């Protein structure tokens, strides 16, 4: 460990200022010795504080407000973000550890890249004195020389950067980003659909607590498509009823099942005898009881003359072939 530097070797701040000693666990004995010597030699108007550098870098605490003098008792190389955190126009004293002469060149380069100014003469061979720039600056980075400003190019102030507007990217990339179809599938994935995927789901409400749920009817000004579904179902039901009504029944209860003897209105069937007189005789073609011949293609009596209700009709075997 190098010989301690007496506190009188450092330039004492003129006026009420704070001296901050930043140390680390690697150099804890030197940190404690320097902090004790500075406190013993500090004037009453000056304040001496000690802090570990990792608390400053982790934002666990902040540096005291200027005017400020900082003593760095740290191993080399210094943390890269420490020099950027030092306030402007602040004098720092870097206490060089022993056996670190090979790293002094990199230390001077790092300080110069952050625009730190050396203070000569140095307090001692093991201590370097520098002053931070008056305005915070970024590390110098080599770049191409900018063209000379012309009449149409505004001159920017020091430290200011012109606003760079983002240009529109490739339109094809934007279209591919929002595309629904994949370019890897020629038909956009339609070939992957099964017939079950293409089937429209039935509008069926499940039972709730064992009770059927009433179906919701479409509004008068429906726009959700429920009205169209209801119209389609009504058309299918009406077509099924019309298909069922095409059946033509003759009077006579020989081959008619019992459940069809009480046919509803609109279908010709076998009614009870007490209601036959009141029943309105109808048929699918509407001509069987109008004195016209049988002309329906599906009628088994096609081509025969008309008969009266209740008349026994006899069909020969030749007519049935």
From Swiss-Prot:
Residues 203-224 are annotated as: Fe-S binding site A. One of its GO terms (cellular component) is cytoplasm. [4Fe-4S] cluster binds at residues 285, 288, 296, 299. Residues 1-161 are annotated as: N-terminal SAM-like domain. Coiled coil: none annotated. A motif (Cx2C motif 1) lies at residues 285-288. [2Fe-2S] cluster binds at residues 203, 219, 222, 224. It is found in: Cytoplasm; Mitochondrion intermembrane space. It holds the Pfam family CIAPIN1. Monomer. Interacts with TAH18. Interacts with MIA40. Component of the cytosolic iron-sulfur (Fe-S) protein assembly (CIA) machinery required for the maturation of extramitochondrial Fe-S proteins. Part of an electron transfer chain functioning in an early step of cytosolic Fe-S biogenesis, facilitating the de novo assembly of a [4Fe-4S] cluster on the scaffold complex CFD1-NBP35. Electrons are transferred to DRE2 from NADPH via the FAD- and FMN-containing protein TAH18. The C-terminal domain binds 2 Fe-S clusters but is otherwise mostly in an intrinsically disordered conformation. The N-terminal domain has structural similarity with S-adenosyl-L-methionine-dependent methyltransferases, but does not bind S-adenosyl-L-methionine. It is required for correct assembly of the 2 Fe-S clusters. Belongs to the anamorsin family. This is Fe-S cluster assembly protein DRE2. The gene is DRE2.
């Amino acid at each position: 460990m190098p010989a301690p530097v007496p506190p009188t070797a450092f330039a004492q701040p003129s006026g009420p200022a704070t001296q901050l000693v930043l140390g680390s666990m690697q150099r804890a004995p030197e940190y404690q010795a320097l902090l004790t010597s500075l406190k013993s030699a500090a004037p009453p108007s000056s304040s001496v504080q000690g802090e570990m550098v990792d608390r400053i870098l982790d934002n666990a605490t902040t540096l005291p407000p200027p005017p400020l003098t900082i003593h760095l008792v740290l191993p080399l190389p210094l943390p890269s973000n420490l020099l950027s955190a030092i306030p402007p126009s602040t004098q720092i004293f870097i206490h060089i550890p022993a056996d670190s002469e090979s790293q002094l060149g990199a230390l001077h380069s790092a300080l110069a890249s952050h625009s730190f100014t050396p203070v000569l003469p140095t307090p001692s061979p093991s201590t370097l004195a520098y002053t931070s720039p008056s305005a915070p600056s970024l590390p110098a980075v080599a770049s191409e020389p900018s063209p000379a400003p012309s009449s149409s190019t505004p001159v920017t102030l020091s430290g200011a950067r012109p606003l760079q507007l983002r240009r529109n990217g490739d339109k094809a990339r934007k279209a591919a980003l929002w595309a629904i179809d994949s370019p890897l599938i020629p038909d956009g994935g339609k070939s992957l659909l099964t017939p079950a995927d293409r089937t429209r789901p039935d509008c069926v409400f499940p039972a709730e607590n064992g009770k059927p749920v009433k179906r919701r009817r479409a509004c008068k000004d429906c726009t959700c498509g429920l009205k169209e579904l209801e119209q389609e179902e009504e058309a299918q039901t009406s077509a099924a009823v019309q298909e069922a009504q095409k059946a033509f029944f003759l009077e006579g209860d020989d081959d008619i099942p019992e459940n069809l003897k009480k046919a509803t209105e609109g279908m010709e069937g076998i009614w009870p005898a007490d209601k036959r007189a009141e029943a309105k005789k109808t048929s699918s073609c509407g001509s069987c009881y109008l004195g016209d011949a049988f002309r329906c293609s599906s009628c088994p009596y096609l081509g025969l003359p008309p008969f009266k209700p209740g008349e026994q009709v006899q069909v020969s075997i030749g007519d049935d072939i």
